[in-house]
Amino acid sequence: MGIRGLMSFVEDHSNEFFTDLKLRDTKIVIDGYALFHRLCFSSNLDLRYGGDYDSFADVVQKFFESLFACNICPYVVLDGGCDISDKKLTTLKDRAREKIQMAHSLSVGGSGYVCPLLIREVFIQVLIKLRVCFVQCFSEADRDIMTLANHWNCPVLSSDSDFCIFDLKTGFCPLNSFQWRNMDTIKGTQNYIPAKCFSLDAFCHHFSNMNKALLPLFAVLCGNDHVNLPIMETFLSKARLPLGATSSKGRRHHRILGLLNWLSHFANPTEALDNVLKYLPKKDRENVKELLCCSMEEYQQSQVKLQDFFQCGTYVCPDALNLGLPEWVLVALAKGQLSPFISDALVLRRTILPTQVENMQQPNAHRISQPIRQIIYGLLLNASPHLDKTSWNALPPQPLAFSEVERINKNIRTSIIDAVELAKDHSDLSRLTELSLRRRQMLLLETLKVKQTILEPIPTSLKLPIAVSCYWLQHTETKAKLHHLQSLLLTMLVGPLIAIINSPGKEELQEDGAKMLYAEFQRVKAQTRLGTRLDLDTAHIFCQWQSCLQMGMYLNQLLPTPLPEPDLTRLYSGSLVHGLCQQLLASTSVESLLSICPEAKQLYEYLFNATRSYAPAEIFLPKGRSNSKKKRQKKQNTSCSKNRGRTTAHTKCWYEGNNRFGLLMVENLEEHSEASNIE
């Protein structure tokens, strides 16, 4: 939610509407969505390379450490999926278009604000590590945040202008004036965070002591994410809205000023609403009244009692209960163990695929992971008999169809995607948790087209990323080259390196090698950020990989977790993976890079051996050979298997002279064809 222009209006009148706070020794309810966006966009993180998740995790950790140092107890509340009415769909589509334009700008060296794909998952992982209390609401969180803050008599931290409308007992602290990086002390002992708190009383006093109860009507007349009626322009054009005394600053907010001054003349919302309707054609009045009243309800207390979740672990949401969803699904959603992507697919049979900083001239990067989503949709098909009566009643029966809002060029379109019909024991969502670990793991790996034996030498924490990488390599849409795969696998070594460095039992020599390699990775990452131009094709390839990982994680969560969830904060760093690509293309070899740390070298070999059997043969050819090989294949028109066999015979020990990659052992390429045919 959010009221257009209101936040900048109140900030223009900061001295009148805000009071200074020294925040300490209190609970605080935090709008999680607003916080992770704010931290992502205000921390000098590079947004071009698909996410420096390690750096973002560090920022999130420092933020909460500042709160802890001031004895501030945070409770983070995250938005869930869209509600059953889907009333924000138009707004969401508009935002999706805006994100595409910003992603395009970033991709060609311009500016823009686009969250990396896995930022929400990283944020939740950091909350869990720090033991910060959090909940994921079933749908939009604003009302639940307001209700909880009033129950606990504590402030709200957000950047959403709707919190200027809610009647909050202890007030609303905007994130942009919450100076957590500039912690101060009282008498040299008690830490506090300087902040500003919005005063609703001062705001209403400024407008002739207007009744607070009029503000929800102001919000819907002004236009928020839920209401944007063209007919309201009729009212605004006919009503002579008094601007009052306006400064040069106030002219850009003439609609806000006019509405507030006009509304301040009425005693209550009923009187004001009747006067609004007078300006509209009689035939429209009843419908408009119903819509406005319904939208004003969005600013009332919520029925959800989040304090029960934080104190007892019970989350009761009437809207969710009315849908008859399985209990385990509701619990997993509240705990953030299932993504809002799942609830959108479940409730609306519609998902929105977020754009990344990718090549806009190519098909969107999420195309590659569509088969994984089709399995997810198949698992959600028979979730509840109530869903067909609610979300799907206006459409002709399409029992296997889901819709996806996706990027096409620099716009969006809605595509109809068929779900995969699964075996009977997989198609009952309520009983999915009863399936054995073996069955759930089998479904996950069959979807990813990976043999379980391939993953046996892989550390538990990397099994899912490696399985996803095998899936990614098998798809023809992926134009990955050897250096892309190598860079990705090298980046996966960061977590194990940190573990070696922090392990007290390791010998000094091992620790030194790990420290040196980690320092080299940090140097590469820093060098990449200095301004090298983004390689769009490389960016697109890694966007495809991230999409596969995201959907692989969502399927893994839904099954639930037959493989451990990877630590995203140490798994992928966009700046590092792009920098390693450049180095491997220029001169460095993997062998020379890893020579300083034998443990990392051994792990890399395990990862490489697992993935190489799923890679197309041409990925291992020296530069210049791949294209000629393709031409030769066309000319000879031989079968795929014969070509693979012949390639293997000729490329068992290629030495890639240009890049000094050393010997690339590819004697097991035949396994690729076997692994693609999972039973």
Swiss-Prot record:
Residues 626-635 have a biased composition (Basic residues). The keyword tRNA processing does not apply. GO terms for biological process: double-strand break repair via homologous recombination; double-strand break repair via nonhomologous end joining. It comes from the Eukaryota. GO terms for molecular function: 3' overhang single-stranded DNA endodeoxyribonuclease activity; single-stranded DNA endodeoxyribonuclease activity. Residues 625-645 are annotated as: Disordered. Its EC number is 3.1.-.-. Keywords: Hydrolase. The keyword Hydrolase applies. Structure-specific DNA endonuclease that specifically cleaves single-stranded DNA and 3' overhang DNA. Contributes to the control of DNA double-strand break repair choice by antagonizing BRCA1-dependent homologous recombination (HR) and promoting non-homologous end-joining (NHEJ). Recruited to the single-stranded DNA ends by SHLD2 and cleaves the 3' exposed DNA ends, therefore inhibiting DNA end resection (necessary for HR) and promoting DNA end protection (necessary for NHEJ). This is Single-strand DNA endonuclease ASTE1.
